[in-house]
Amino acid sequence: MFLGASGSTGNSCKNKYGFNYQGVLLLILIFFTSLSFLSAQEMATKSGTGFRQVSGIYPHLAFYNNEDECGTGAVVVWAGRLWAITYGPHLPFGSSDKLYEITPGLEQRVHPESTGGTPANRMIHKESNQLFTGPYAIDPTGNVRVIPYDKMPGRHTGNARHLFTPAGKIYYATMEEGFYEVDVKTLEPVLLYEDTNVTNKKESSERETVPVASLFGVHGKGVYSGQGVMVYSNNGEAGQKALEQFDIEAGSLSEWDGREWKLVRRNQFVEVTGPGGIYGNDHPDSDPIWATGWDHKSVILGVRNPSTGWDFFRLPKASHSYDGAHGWNTEWPRIRDIGTKENPDYLMTMHGMFWRFPDKFTAENSAGIRPRSAYLKVIGDFTRWNDQLVFGCDDSAQKEFLNKRKHKGDIEGPGQSNSNLWFTSPGKPDQLGTITASGAVWLNEEVKAGEYSEPFLFAGWPGRSVWIHHQGEQPADFTFEVDKTGNRNWTKLRTVQVEAGESLFNGFNEDETGEWIRVSVNSPSVATVSFNYSGAENRTASPSAAFDGLAQVNDQKALGGLLYGLGNNQRKLGVSAVHFDKGKTSETGYYELDEKLNLVKKNDQQTNDFMKENFAIPENVIEIDESSVLIIDDKQRRWRLPLGNSTYKQLTEAAQLRICREVATERDLFHSCGTFYELPAENADGFAKIRPVASHNFRIHDYASYRGMLVMTGIDPEARAGEHIIRSDDGQAAVWTGAIDDLWELGKPAGTGGPWKDTKVKAGEPSDPYLIGFYDNRSLVMSHDATTPVTFRIEAEPVGHGPWMLYQEVTVKPGEKYMHQFPEYFQARWIRFVADQNCSATAWLEYK
């Protein structure tokens, strides 16, 4: 200590001139300590709020509840404040969730009137000048009134303007088809159709007199009104089959005219809105109504006009983690205006893609939908506030629901559910992941001669291709037509002939333009037509400066640690810290990270032991061999992924690298050989739809979500503290913090490998599927050891759950190699190889 017990420095620290060395040393230490935290402090205060932020996430704003999940259902600017509500998973009668009010200075107020539930509704009622969100009505001064759950039970999923008395009443819709009209002055609800959570509690004799909607599907999401109807969406299906199979019939879009319900379409739908957005349409009799949905083939976009009703279009999916017949994996996709009054700018979220959506979109004026960029966050709602975008997210669920797999081991979810807001610039939706995406119009389905597919989005991608599979009895002509301007005028683009039982791959050139494309066939077929589009890959292999401080994979030393979000309202992140040093691992102790991003050592052996037992990295859940990474999923399907730096094999086998963990609700972040992947839940087809996000050369030990942030360990011991690197008070532990979507800046996906490397193969037996989708600059080298020429079928699977299709058939002479550079427009999900004779063969792919 510099000071003695009495507080005096004494004379022993002075030289003969009376100079106090220890005092100077103390000043020097304080100076350099302040330097090491200067960058972090600047980042904490640059918004003018004084609160620490990391990648647009303010830890102190995190939302917690006592439920199995804590998602953000709505974020709305009102009364000079930002208002947010959270939800638990199935709580139609209330919960521990709260109504939050956030000031421009980012101070958070938790409203004592909060009654919780599973709300995601929000509407501003212009005539009464009130915001309705959840069971709350908020006036222009911020006063809150509450509609009790005993009067209006259900999981409030949406509001709509009243069809007959819009100035005095609004509609409430629940996720289980409960419908109410509410007086905006008295807040008295009148039951229209009973929520099935209430109905199911009644005796059978009581149910007979209760009005129920009895719509197709379950798990309601969106509601909107106009053109004389109220439109409502269900995005799921009930039953055990829906929990396991993603491609069964599920969900519905329905409309109600004030008397009767009508089924519009039997698919999974989510958002229902219009150009009026949160206010309702300005011209309800004529303004369009929009609806978004999906099936196992592609995204579905519906638009209603008053004269002819509904028209439907299709768009590709960037991510399949939103799939699942039960509908649980979507949260609330939205279309919202994030522009200004002078310049509207509608942003659509759907299946992992930010989309630019035209504010005047109709069936006759359908031009302008464009992909902006892909994202990883799970977003429940968003708005523009103070020239920033604010995304309300669903980050850390204590219960991982159906998202279990052996590759995670026996790991648990966080001890307490929590989520946060994500603040970004208005341009952020254009700056994240590549827009590579795919979708089918027909998938192994019977098609009549002359039948047209639904229009599929054709504009917005630099690389476009189509895969066709024809299971007919005779050759068929597939004719493609385009709507060049989105006004329903179709012109022929090209016709291709496909032999019976065969497939065809075609690329489109830059001169083949149009807003929408459709296809027809001139003879009966069981057909698959998949459009696979490539985005421009402008990233390099170098990570951004945000990742400075992470240890390199070949480094002998690193600061590691297992991570666990604590429960029991502690609201901290536990870190069971370790040192890696020249192949040896030593425990450092137990630390906790708090909302101010202080990492402090704690004397808590019980929690440390709990973490080591329940969050250990599993062993032997993937196999790294000479050719690739072998994955055997929970359904015993085999998949292969590219290799990275050779050191990853040793570290993986030593269980020093986390392989799989949920860091955004109901999907996993998979990590193998230096590549992060988005991995859908098994009920959304799992590894078949895996998507590479970024590749790197870092030694990442563990990763987890906490207060909306992505937290990682595996830090260079010499790294200094900054915006992203948090060091402990004793300097012996450290973590990296950021947003999950920072991962796009790690480096573009790359790797080498293949399903065969000097592998003994049997004639006619396909190789394991090997991932080829979402990479660029791809090349192939094939060889064999046979004494006679070998013919290889190179097959691709563009869908993930569709048929294998022939890409090329090549013959390789003895002692020679076949080399191929895939065209830039080539896009498929998986590739495999088949030899026509027994031999030892190599199929080696390089993704640079």
Task: Show where each model-derived region lies.
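Beta-propeller blade signature
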Residues: D97-P104, E181, L243-E260, L301-P306, ...
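Loop/turn-rich, solvent-exposed surfaces of beta-rich toroidal or solenoidal domains
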Residues: I289-A291, S298-V299, L315-T362, F456-A459, ...
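Noncatalytic modules at the cell exterior or secretory-pathway interfaces
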Residues: E510-A527, E824-C839
